[in-house]
């Protein structure tokens, strides 16, 4: 499974990776750590058929730029840019330390707490993604036989 994580906090990122490794066997992770780098990366993937991400996980608040300490509600920009430039069909999870009410199109949300494991949350998300993927495969097979 190929997962793209947009997260500025190293400690939180390490915890996320640890918990993802516990629930995903064949895991490849690519990380971006600020809003502008993510937006530029997404733009570079536009019209690129090599995009093979299975899940995007993004923080809700993070610095706009690498050397900035001012946090912005970046999830809105990240999600909209990803959907416009990369893929409308890849599931998106907002993983935030703060309760959030992001008014945009995401599939999953996880409230991050440093003392709580995310394994159960990630396991449910991965199971749901796999179930939906299997359902799509079944639909394609049925369409072949119906023709």
Residue ranges: model-predicted function:
Residues 7-8, 96:
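Conserved acidic carboxylate
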Residues 52-88:
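Conserved phosphotransfer microenvironments
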Residues 54, 107-110:
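Conserved acidic residues
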Residues 31-55, 63:
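Acidic, metal-coordinating helix/loop segments flanking the phosphotransfer/catalytic sites
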């Amino acid at each position: 499974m190929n997962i793209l994580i947009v997260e500025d906090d190293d400690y939180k990122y390490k915890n996320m990776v640890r918990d993802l490794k516990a629930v995903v066997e064949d895991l490849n992770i690519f990380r971006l750590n600020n809003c502008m780098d993510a937006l530029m990366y997404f733009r570079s993937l536009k019209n690129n058929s090599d995009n093979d991400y299975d899940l995007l996980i993004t923080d809700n608040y993070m610095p706009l730029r690498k050397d900035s300490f001012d946090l912005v509600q970046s999830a809105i920009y990240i999600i909209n840019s990803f959907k416009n430039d990369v893929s409308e069909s890849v599931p998106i999870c907002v993983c935030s330390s703060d309760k959030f009410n992001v008014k945009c199109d995401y599939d999953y949300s996880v409230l991050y707490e440093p003392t709580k494991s995310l394994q159960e949350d990630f396991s449910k998300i991965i199971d749901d993604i796999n179930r939906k993927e299997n359902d799509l495969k079944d639909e394609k097979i049925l369409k072949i036989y119906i023709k």
